[in-house]
Amino acid sequence: MAKVITVLGSTNIDKVVSVPRFGVSGETLHTPNHQVEAMGGKGLNQGVAVARSAVKTNMITKVGKEFDTAKNMNVANLNTEHVMYSETEETGQAYITVSEETGDNIIYIYGGANADMTTEDVRAHTDAIKESDFVIAQLETSMETVIEGFKIAHENGVKTILNPAPMPEDGGLPAELLNLTDVIAPNEHETFLLTGIEVTDEHSMIDNAAYYFERGIDTVIITVGSEGAFYMRKDGAEGIVPSFKVKAVDTTAAGDTFIGAMSTRLNPNLDNLPEAMRYGAAASSLTVQRAGAQPSIPMEEEVLKVLEDNK
């Protein structure tokens, strides 16, 4: 189990509206409720998922000067000493529509202060990375900042976990970043954009994993929504961890919760990956039953109860 995890990534203010279903171009739909604001961003979601599973979490992120950190990041175990403030940009924004029909979402992001983070900003927080068992990053800050954070991690023997989302428009990631990544955790769509191999069955997931192994990554996790998650290590160990079957209300932050919660149970040598993934799946099953991003992320005791009830 990890003792300290650093999350390098985004903070957004989520503006969420429910719709009966997703419309088509030119169509107008009534919404059953007003727009709801909540804290989110893939980075902060993952950080909160780690913190709520009772592990110290260093949050390296950048927000606008207007952001009230004490209020908006008031989460036990979440260390906000590494939050930075942009002089020129406001806090990032995410505009989220959630289908009441399926619980699925569509998200549009304005980067704001997330895009203002620099490699110098990251390097200034080397101490946070050095004390960690894992560094987790996503792609809502610049590619350069993620590479810098992973360089620091590797310089200090810290394992790196990459959630390659949102994927760049060209569908590619720098070879340098892949080579600095110990664990990559895309979903089925993201891995298709990276590898060109569509996920249709376990054999195709193995083919996807081979692509990453050739580029220096030792451990691959591919999430496939309600079907669960596939894993494979370079030593040949592989399998599928099924999801917990629940009725989804809102899938926002489901993947972030899985990654953050899973990482808290991982041993630094990754020898308990399936067990850690099952913990992450249990946490994610709670998230999808609730509305919103950060508000939906469960506490450790809730996750442990799900595991106990599903032995």
Regions of interest found by a model, annotated:
Residues M1, E202-K311:
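Conserved phosphate-binding/catalytic region of the ribokinase-like
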Residues M1-S25:
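Positively charged, low-complexity intrinsically disordered leader regions
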Residues V4-I5, L29-Q93, V306-N310:
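Substrate-binding N-lobe of the ribokinase-like
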Residues S25-H34, E238-V246:
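Glycine/charged-rich beta-loop-alpha catalytic/anionic-binding loops adjacent to active sites
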Residues V48, Q93-T97, I106, G228-M232:
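Short beta-strand scaffold segments in enzyme catalytic cores
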Residues A51, I147-E155, F213:
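Surface-exposed amphipathic alpha-helices with a cationic face
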Residues M59, Y85-S86, I96-F134, L139:
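Conserved phosphate-binding/catalytic loop of the ribokinase/pfkB sugar-kinase fold
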Residues E155-E238:
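Conserved phosphate/ATP/ADP-binding segment of small-molecule kinases
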